[in-house]
């Protein structure tokens, strides 16, 4: 089955065509500045379109050059927020599209853009099966004590204020890969997965199910990220409001000017590491704060899963920054974690163990592949519906 995987943003459209049977990527690309001018990159030169419908025409042309007479069988969409309704991928129809739109208040920057992609596909290929794969779905198994905030019940019942979690597609995919590497059925996998990119989250997995995760009502909660603060005292927001900051100013501060950028002046982990190694005190502090925050979460989630059978690093930083992994590992000695310096420093695109034989908890690096996960989920839903 050939699946077109779509990640539709408000001004961008990322696409990839996967052959599900062979796991191969046939073509991929990114169209940017939709409605804003020219922009695009991929296997062919793509100029910026007026809207998502025009963007899709350009995607179609680029795909046709590669596929020739072969045709797409389905489209899988990354949808950021599935709320409490969607706990698994679903075949999209008009009612599902409207349900996703009703969740717009919970993800105002993402869900409306996801729907633009869905509607563009439906207009161009009305008979094409479309499947929504939700970032939040894997975390629908969180027990109430993990997803509840200690605020009046009316905030949950009237406004849906609770912890949802994100990066679920990645965490689920990586948990299966990690279990296979350890020769365990996924139903017996108890572990902690750290998805570390510009956005970062850590998830506690028990029996193959998510039982806690660091992101909450929004992707702002939790770890120190590229430009997001992660956890902080909520009274700081009240303090800033009383000092004259607008809600827009505070939102921008916490989501776009904080994290590594706020601490070190740069949101790119590679640059922060280089600066730290060159003696930059701000960069060293940023790494210390970020690694300490993650280590605290890992310790707590070791308890949440009843004793972790594995600690797994994934995503851009988790897969590639051996120095950051070492900083985190050094803080986990109380759990019996011991990284092998040689294995940790090796680069590979394959799942691998980077801990010593004496480590009480195996430490793994497992590359994530969200597009593959979305393509496989899409194929499964379409097959079950046929």
Curated annotation (Swiss-Prot):
Q: Which cysteines are joined by disulfide bonds?
A: none
**What is the first-listed, main subcellular location in coarse terms?**
cytoplasm
Kindly list the GO CC terms recorded for this protein: cytoplasm
**Pfam families per the UniProt record, alphabetical:** Acetate_kinase (PF00871)
Which InterPro entries does this entry report, sorted A to Z?
A: Ac/propionate_kinase, Aliphatic_acid_kin_short-chain, Aliphatic_acid_kinase_CS, ATPase_NBD
Enzyme class comes to transferase
Tell me the residue numbers annotated for binding substrate.
78
- What Gene Ontology biological process does one annotation of this record name? acetyl-CoA biosynthetic process
* Intracellular or extracellular location(s): Cytoplasm
Recorded superkingdom: Bacteria
Residue sites binding ATP per the record: 14, 195-199, 268-270, 316-320
Q: How is the cofactor bound?
A: Mg(2+). Can also accept Mn(2+).
Q: What pathway is it annotated to?
A: Metabolic intermediate biosynthesis; acetyl-CoA biosynthesis; acetyl-CoA from acetate: step 1/2
Residues that hold Mg(2+) according to the record: 7, 370
Its Enzyme Commission number(s) read 2.7.2.1
Identify the keywords attached in UniProt to this record, alphabetized. ATP-binding, Cytoplasm, Kinase, Magnesium, Metal-binding, Nucleotide-binding, Transferase
Q: Which GO terms describe its molecular function?
A: acetate kinase activity; ATP binding; magnesium ion binding
Answer whether the UniProt record assigns the keyword DNA-binding to this protein. no
The UniProt catalytic activity note for this protein reads: acetate + ATP = acetyl phosphate + ADP
Subunit info here reads: Homodimer.
Listed HAMAP family: Acetate_kinase
Purpose of the protein: Catalyzes the formation of acetyl phosphate from acetate and ATP. Can also catalyze the reverse reaction.
Task: Please identify the protein, giving its name as recorded.
Answer: Acetate kinase
Q: Whose protein is this, by species?
A: Arthrobacter sp. (strain FB24)
Q: Which gene encodes it?
A: ackA
